[in-house]
Amino acid sequence: MLKDRFIADIIASKESLVGGRVRVCGWAYRIRDLGRLKFILVRDRSGVIQATVKRGESPEDALRAAEDLKLESVVCVEGELRQAPTREGVEVKVERLEVLSTPVEPLPLEVEGSEKASLPTRLKYRWLDIRNPMVSAIFELEAMVAKVFRDYYWSQGFVEIFTPKIVAAGTESGAEVFPVVYFDKTAFLAQSPQFYKQFAVIAGLERVFEIGPVFRAEPHHTSRHLNEYHSLDIEVGFIESYNDVMNYVEGFMRAIVRMLEEDGRRVLELYGVELPRIPASGIPKIPLRKAYEILEEKYGKKVEYGEDLDSEGERLMGAYAGEELDSDFVFIVEYPWKVRPFYTMRKDDEPSWTYSFDLLYRGLEIVTGGQREHRYHRLLENLRDKGLDAESFQFYLDFFKHGAPPHGGAGMGLERIVMQTLKLENIREARMLPRDTERITP
């Protein structure tokens, strides 16, 4: 390996390394030429360190390599680690400078300060944008959230599954699916692993989770939607009610907050955002019908009875939770049947309403879930009431013919969780290579 440690590792161990020889590999982030002395800031994924090349001290080959060095050249430097009046408290006195690669044309996007450029430009030259430590921190956090998800649900007795992404039918009517060429059959990209999460529970795995891509053919042009994103999904059998599912979702949110407190402080400080708040008593739950009243009485916003919340309604309910309940999270529960999928369990005493929920995080829906209908005959009724053809979903209905436990689950948007944690303006910032109605490259 050309590189055996990150810059952050060197800085963390600087007391024991000062006076010794170190090797640093990364990109030339800044170059300052003072004639006889040249300062090169070398950046890698973990941080930045200063390297100094000085005439009369550094070897001639190092001086020659430094002479024509360009920004964003890939370099390896070797030399003595010594104390210096830098932010890191150390620098590398260069004894060897190796240029592994150099730009062949002017940079179309300056790495330093790239977050201030227009978003289309940043996404067009994403490989340069992500070199900016401010931007790469987003994806470090995203990886940390995914790891917390996996670790938390493993600890709760869940099994990780890997479901098909080429499917025979959408989870709904098929209006929001991407068709794909699949030999002589009709097929689509999966909107959700919903059917196969339920399959796994019914097949006896009982508690399952998945991290995977989902695809939505919705012609949105908003700062909150993507046509491809990563979904964090759970499904759990033998529940008493949908409250059991919400408890598992809340457990994951608390695990995220612990991670941020212990390992994510650097990223939060980089973005100047505070730790998310969850009351000790639990994430508050507000029935949607109560939310209608709150929105009208407190904010003068009227929502038609039986309708879903729009983005403004979600934002205002998030503000209400923050101001009145001291929580950055709030569950909105009992959604109308007409705005929920056919597999959602309806209330026996109020069939126009369902055992379902959304979780809002700082005013944006990041989780949708609920209890599923596990009774075969009720599923047939639900399909009929939705005006859907049962024959198109027969492969799914077959799962329920031989004993299905009461179960429920949730789908969580990874990018939305990161977006709300860092208070990003656009969800595309939280996706390494976003796909939307206008973008399919890079």
Swiss-Prot record:
Its EC number is 6.1.1.23. Belongs to the class-II aminoacyl-tRNA synthetase family. Type 2 subfamily. PANTHER family: ASPARTATE--TRNA LIGASE, CYTOPLASMIC (PTHR43450:SF1), ASPARTYL-TRNA SYNTHETASE (PTHR43450). Mg(2+) 3 binds at residue 365. The lineage of its organism: Archaea, Thermoproteota, Thermoprotei, Desulfurococcales, Desulfurococcaceae. It comes from Aeropyrum pernix (strain ATCC 700893 / DSM 11879 / JCM 9820 / NBRC 100138 / K1). Aspartyl-tRNA synthetase with relaxed tRNA specificity since it is able to aspartylate not only its cognate tRNA(Asp) but also tRNA(Asn). Reaction proceeds in two steps: L-aspartate is first activated by ATP to form Asp-AMP and then transferred to the acceptor end of tRNA(Asp/Asn). L-aspartate binds at residues 172, 216, 368, 372. Transmembrane segments: none annotated. ATP binds at residues 216-218, 224-226, 365, 413-416. This is Aspartate--tRNA(Asp/Asn) ligase. The record marks 85 as: Important for tRNA non-discrimination. Keywords: Aminoacyl-tRNA synthetase, ATP-binding, Cytoplasm, Ligase, Magnesium, Metal-binding, Nucleotide-binding, Protein biosynthesis. One of its GO terms (molecular function) is ATP binding. It catalyses: tRNA(Asx) + L-aspartate + ATP = L-aspartyl-tRNA(Asx) + AMP + diphosphate. Binds 3 Mg(2+) cations per subunit. The strongest magnesium site (Mg1) is bound to the beta- and gamma-phosphates of ATP and four water molecules complete its coordination sphere. The gene is aspS. Mg(2+) 2 binds at residues 365, 368.
